[in-house]
Amino acid sequence: MPTLSQVRQSNTALGAQRQKMVAVFVGGTSGIGEATAKQMALAVKQPTIHLVGRNPASGSRVLEELRASNPNGSYNFIQSDVSLLRSVDKACEEITDKEKQIDLLFMSTGHLSLSKNETDEGLDDNHALRYYSRMRFVQNLMPLLSASPGPARVVSILAGGQEGTMEEDNFDLTKSWSFTKANTYAATLNSLAIEHLATAHPTVSFLHVFPGIVRTPLMNASFGNYGGAILSFLSRPISMSPEESGERNLFLSTSAAYPPATPKDPSQLGVPLVKGVDTASASTGKVGGGSYILKYDGSNATREKLMADYRARSFPSKVWDHTLETFKRVLRSD
């Protein structure tokens, strides 16, 4: 696994390797997304960063801080409740109106929920945040990701390595819901989807990452101010700062350790590997295979037997077919 020193060495080299970079951060106005966007602004000489979030005040604050850290960058906030797929579509329209290519799509929305809460689109809001809206961003922005000269990357921050069994007729949790199912299904759907996507779009790499325990507003958002404060205090000895998380996630987003399955240019895989860091094994077991299930430190978190069993039963394609059918049903589109 890459050490923090190796992470920082790679991030320092990013500025020389890529003078410009276009990135979209869904959930970029707080927590891990905000921290990673800030690290990118520090590392890349002329970044273009789009932040997608619900809170305009938070968006304005982060934009000010990004401009202060790197005045040569271009920064944009898009207000959107991305628990709604129709809002995702509007946000993507704004991005595609402004950009011809995207190098990084970084998604970190969602929280831990103790109860089910359906949106007016008929999906559990947190399940939408953690899976459906993320995949809608991927689908809508794939032409821009594919247009990147490379390397282009999609990073889904959630629960890599925490997959489990699922009922094939309950992917959307409408048949039955529980706290455990909600977490397991979101993790498993993300991992299966990125395997499908890495095959369908082999010039883009896809990462599903468990970020570790990070000192962010997530605890308060999930359990309220009082409960969140207690949990944050208890977890402090084993948690990391947002700054360290941002550094690690910038590494995952840019290092050549996580290349696409079929790169456009084999010499442009990302920031060249620093000494002691090797090309990662994909969730399929293939080195450099394009779909990566990772721990916070960049090491492999794939549950190999479970994923192989899902693969043998064609679950990556089944999950993606279900995802597209859900988009059609919710959005009433062809």
Regions inferred by a protein language model and the residue ranges of each:
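Amphipathic alpha-helical dimer-interface segment in Rossmann-like NAD(P)H-dependent oxidoreductases
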Residues: 131-149, 195-199
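Glycine-rich NAD(P)-binding loop of the Rossmann-fold in SDR/ketoreductase-type enzymes
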Residues: 83, 125-133, 185, 240
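NAD(P)H-dependent oxidoreductase Rossmann-fold/reductase module
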Residues: 1-78, 94, 169-334
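Conserved sequence/active-site signature of Rossmann-fold short-chain dehydrogenase/reductase
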Residues: 112, 162-163, 214-215
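A glycine-rich helix->loop->beta "capping" turn
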Residues: 71-76, 93-107, 113-118
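Rossmann-fold scaffold of SDR-type NAD(P)-dependent oxidoreductases
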Residues: 26, 99-110, 155-158, 207-211
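Active-site loop of short-chain dehydrogenase/reductase
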Residues: 101-102, 145-166, 202-204
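Short alpha-helical oligomerization interface
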Residues: 112-130, 175-176
